[in-house]
A protein has these predicted regions:
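Acidic, Ser/Thr/Pro
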Residues: 1-249
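Amphipathic alpha-helical interface segments used for dimerization/assembly
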Residues: 20, 28, 273, 289-293
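Hydrophobic beta-strand residues in large extracellular and virion-surface proteins
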Residues: 28, 176, 198, 259-261, ...
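Short Lys/Arg-rich basic patches
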Residues: 244-268, 273
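Short hotspots in intrinsically disordered terminal tails
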Residues: 251, 310-311
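Short, basic amphipathic alpha-helical segments that act as recognition/interaction helices
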Residues: 279-306, 312
């Protein structure tokens, strides 16, 4: 099959969404038809729906506004790169704000009936047997947000145009669920709702090679390592009478290490110590030590994995 041959195409209208199977090595394109439309996007492992795109993990690794050259990650315990943003012509996306919901529009705007991303997502993924409880927070493509002050973020108007697009390379088989964000009373899509075009095609060798390798670590868990492998089939929670705790890495041990400081060193500690520790010199010194270690030796910011671009490899 030719790498540029489109194998699926669909226009999603306002108020709707579409669940699409995208196999590893294929590219999903999400394209503006008229421009100015926010996209709520989610994806699941096609072979295990319990693994899905996790905004929190993606935000930790790539920041508030991931764009071209970043990944969509699943959450713990899998923590895998599921898709790679191969191209992003507008370059404004968001993983700060959650999906909008019917409750939001009734509580904040007084609309007891209103199109919303929760309901659209739930209906689109119902084709694959997933319930409204299986909806999770969206990756918001073409959504402009900013941190506006202490403890606050805000949505701003956007300037995407007809023909702007995002290309997502599937790294594993995924069910990609895209919907037209239902927020027509917010700046999200400039107070309007417009259609979007989806298409799927095979990636070229060069496009597949563009995604840098991500680490495969022993600490990543898969269902094979779970002590409970079967998914619960009922909704009520009941205690397992045969349960015996088997926590990892316990029992924990704490060892005191004596550290002698000179008068000058004590003065230096006093100058940088955090006041929260009061008179506890040991806690203050431990904070200084680990803060120093973080700044110099932590592999990635905020505990993010190190991702080396192939072009940077010797």
């Amino acid at each position: 099959m030719a790498a540029n041959k489109v194998i699926f195409e669909h226009v999603i209208q306002p108020g709707t969404g579409k669940a699409v199977e995208v196999r590893a090595g294929q590219i999903l394109r999400i394209e503006q038809v008229e421009g100015g439309q926010c996209v709520d996007f989610n994806c699941f492992n096609l072979n295990d729906y319990k693994e899905f795109m996790h905004c929190g993990r993606t935000r930790t690794v790539h920041g508030f506004h991931p764009s071209k050259g970043t990944f969509l990650w699943s959450g713990p315990p899998r923590e895998r790169a599921m898709m790679f943003i191969l191209e992003d012509t507008y370059g404004r996306n968001d993983v700060l704000f959650p999906r909008c919901s019917a409750y939001l529009y009734e509580s904040a705007y007084g609309f007891d009936v209103h199109t919303n991303c929760q309901d659209i997502q739930a209906e689109a993924q119902r084709e694959y047997g997933l319930t409204p409880d299986d909806v999770h927070d969206s990756f918001n493509f073409f959504m402009c947000t900013e941190v506006s002050g202490p403890h606050r973020a805000q949505i701003t108007r956007q300037e995407s145009r007809a023909g702007d697009y995002v290309d997502l390379l599937a790294l594993i088989d995924v069910l990609a669920v895209t919907n037209v964000c239902g927020a027509d009373v917010m700046r999200t899509s400039n107070f309007s709702l417009k259609p979007l075009r989806l298409s799927v095609r095979p990636a070229t060798d060069a496009e597949r090679a563009a995604a840098p390798p991500t680490p495969i670590l022993r600490s990543q868990r898969t269902p094979e390592s779970f002590r409970v492998r079967n998914i619960k089939a009922d909704r009520e929670l009941r205690a397992d009478p045969t349960y015996r705790p088997e926590f990892r890495n316990v029992p924990l041990t704490v060892e005191d290490v004596a550290v002698e400081l000179s008068a000058n060193e004590m003065a230096a500690l006093a100058a940088v110590r955090q006041p929260i520790y009061g008179d506890d010199d040991g806690a203050a010194l431990r904070d200084v030590l680990f803060s120093w270690w973080e700044e110099r030796f932590l592999a990635g910011s905020s505990g993010a994995p190190v991702i080396s671009n192939k072009a940077d490899s010797p």
